[in-house]
């Protein structure tokens, strides 16, 4: 399952593949989304050439709801270019601008301890600072621990400036399923080139068969 080498490189990729874990959890346990942790994002939205793709991460507690439509003025949203991060109540206030390579985002995945294959239980994601446009959420490290009968995987993202693509570099990776279409930007094309968003222009396509079947399209600057 080579696809999981990509899972945590970018937040959009994480949101897409989290849907597969949630579907697996529902099919195995009959349970829906886990309840959101305090201050965690409840959804991630990406606006791209196909419209808006939402990724619902967790259910808000009590009578609170998680907005899944593109709206910068709903009082529960942080907007960053073509991305929105949704919260059960208000988003973090007065976030400072991230410094280069500063910790910007932490993801926490809970699994049932000693399960094989691992049984996914819940997700939480926390924003620590405002990463400027032109910078990416980039994987820096991940840790694993066990506590109270649960395995916890924590993934750390830093705010890093996009590099310029080389001649043979992948500029975008596109994930497409029957329910979602997301683009993961890898680098910036030179000024006279563009990174295509049409899957038919891909130089390599991988078909992944899991609970959710989807294609991965690798794009190069043209």
Swiss-Prot record:
Protein location: Secreted
Predominant cellular place of this UniProt entry's protein: secreted
UniProt GO MF annotations: toxin activity
Record note on modification: Contains 8 disulfide bonds.
Domain of life: Eukaryota
Keywords for the protein's UniProt record, in alphabetical order: Disulfide bond, Secreted, Signal, Toxin
Gene Ontology, cellular component aspect: extracellular region
Tissue expression: Expressed by the venom gland.
Record bears the keyword Secreted: yes
Family: Belongs to the scoloptoxin-11 family.
Protein name according to UniProt: U-scoloptoxin(11)-Sm5a
């Amino acid at each position: 399952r080579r696809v999981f080498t990509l899972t945590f490189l970018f937040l959009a990729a994480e949101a897409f593949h989290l849907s597969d874990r949630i579907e697996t959890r529902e099919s195995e346990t009959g349970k829906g989304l886990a309840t959101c942790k305090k201050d965690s994002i409840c959804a991630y939205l990406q606006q791209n050439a196909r419209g808006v793709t939402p990724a619902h991460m967790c259910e808000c507690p009590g009578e609170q709801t998680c907005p899944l439509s593109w709206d910068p003025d709903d009082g529960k949203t942080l907007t960053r270019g073509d991305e929105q991060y949704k919260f059960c109540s208000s988003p973090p206030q007065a976030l400072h601008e991230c410094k280069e390579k500063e910790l910007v985002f932490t993801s926490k995945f809970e699994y049932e301890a000693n399960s094989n294959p691992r049984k996914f239980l819940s997700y939480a994601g926390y924003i620590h600072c405002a990463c400027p446009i032109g910078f990416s959420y980039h994987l820096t490290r991940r840790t694993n621990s066990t506590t109270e009968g649960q395995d916890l995987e924590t993934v750390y993202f830093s705010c890093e400036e996009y590099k310029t693509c080389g001649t043979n570099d992948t500029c975008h990776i596109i994930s497409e399923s029957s329910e979602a279409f997301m683009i993961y930007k890898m680098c910036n094309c030179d000024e006279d080139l563009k990174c295509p968003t049409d899957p038919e222009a891909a130089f390599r396509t991988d078909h992944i068969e899991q609970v959710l079947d989807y294609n991965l399209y690798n794009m190069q600057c043209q």
